UniProtKB/Swiss-Prot annotation:
It holds the Pfam family FAD_binding_6. It comes from the Bacteria. It catalyses: 2 reduced [4Fe-4S]-[ferredoxin] + NADP(+) + H(+) = 2 oxidized [4Fe-4S]-[ferredoxin] + NADPH. It comes from Sorangium cellulosum (strain So ce56). Transports electrons between NADPH and ferredoxin. Can transfer electrons to ferredoxins Fdx2 and Fdx8. Prefers NADPH to NADH. PANTHER family: FLAVODOXIN_FERREDOXIN--NADP REDUCTASE, OXIDOREDUCTASE FAD/NAD(P)-BINDING DOMAIN PROTEIN. This is Ferredoxin--NADP reductase A. Belongs to the ferredoxin--NADP reductase type 1 family.
Length: 278
């Protein structure tokens, strides 16, 4: 047993593409987290823990843990992790942390969850939280990727979550899913910043433009997207929040190459919630 970690058993492995995969594992009864947080996860290699920061794609009321990962060519961890099989074990850190929790936002009417690539992971946790729908009148989750096939969880967000026996009734009238692609033909093309600046996203969803009086946002994805979107929001009067002071929008810096959390020891080359410019 590695101090500070529990050993969890892999229950399911799903390969979305040659570059994206999801793991589901057992969950220690003692492991607690807030929806939107991340923890350290990895393997024992040569007798030592090899771990990276991973957002939890599962909700805190679920009995299993879920992780959404890219496959980094020659990445020390993901080059091994992508070949893991059901029944094998992984390490999961005993402590979760992170900025992307609804408690770090001021009260508002519409919650926007803006993701690129595997930055979708923490928002999968947030949209499965009943409290999210108690606090906000509308929830919009956007996912921008390079290719259509990279839009992992699209069916889940478009259909399956709304049909969920426990959550469907509160999700259906409030959740909107807005995917976009940057390098292929698709019904919605373009980077999320361009779609926000042009007003296309607001026209498509029949919603008003962003207003700091009632809109709240969370951002997770590539460092370029985070910087560009934060600048766009700041120019419109939005104030960034953190774990100490709630704000109008939140950025998970643990995966952005800045103000790295003590738990986020992932190197930029293998950061699990980073995707390149979409």
């Amino acid at each position: 047993m590695v101090p500070g970690y529990t050993e969890e058993t892999v229950l399911e492995v799903h390969h979305w593409t040659d570059k994206l995969f999801t793991l589901k594992t057992t969950r220690s009864p003692s492991f607690r987290f807030a929806n939107g947080q991340f923890c350290m996860m990895g393997l024992v290699v040569a007798g030592k823990p090899l771990v990276r920061a991973y957002s939890l794609a599962s909700a805190n009321h679920e009995e299993t843990l879920e992780f959404f990962s890219i496959k980094v060519p020659n990445g020390p961890l993901t080059s091994r992790l992508q070949h893991i099989a059901v029944g094998e074990t992984i390490l999961v850190g005993k402590r979760a942390t992170g900025t992307l929790t609804i408690g770090n936002l001021r009260p508002g009417r519409t919650l926007w969850l803006l993701a690129t690539g595997t930055g979708l992971a923490p928002f999968l946790s947030v949209v499965k939280d009943p409290e999210t729908y108690e606090r906000f009148e509308r929830v919009v989750i956007t996912h921008t990727c390079r290719r259509v096939q990279d839009l992992a969880y699209a069916r889940y967000l478009e259909h399956e979550l709304a049909a969920d026996e426990l959550l469907g009734e509160i999700v259906r009238p409030k959740l909107r899913y807005y995917p976009s692609v940057t390098r292929e033909a698709f019904k919605t093309e373009g980077r999320i910043t361009a779609l926000l600046e042009s007003g296309r996203i607001f026209a498509d969803l029949a919603l008003p433009a962003l207003d700091p009086a009632h809109d709240r946002l969370m951002l997770c994805g590539s460092s370029e997207m985070l910087a560009d979107t934060a600048a766009l929001l700041e120019a419109r009067g939005f104030e960034e929040g953190n774990s100490g002071e709630p704000g109008d929008y939140l950025v998970e810096k643990a995966f952005a190459g800045e103000k790295r959390s003590p738990l986020a020891s992932a190197s930029p080359a293998e950061s699990t919630n980073l995707s390149g410019p979409a």
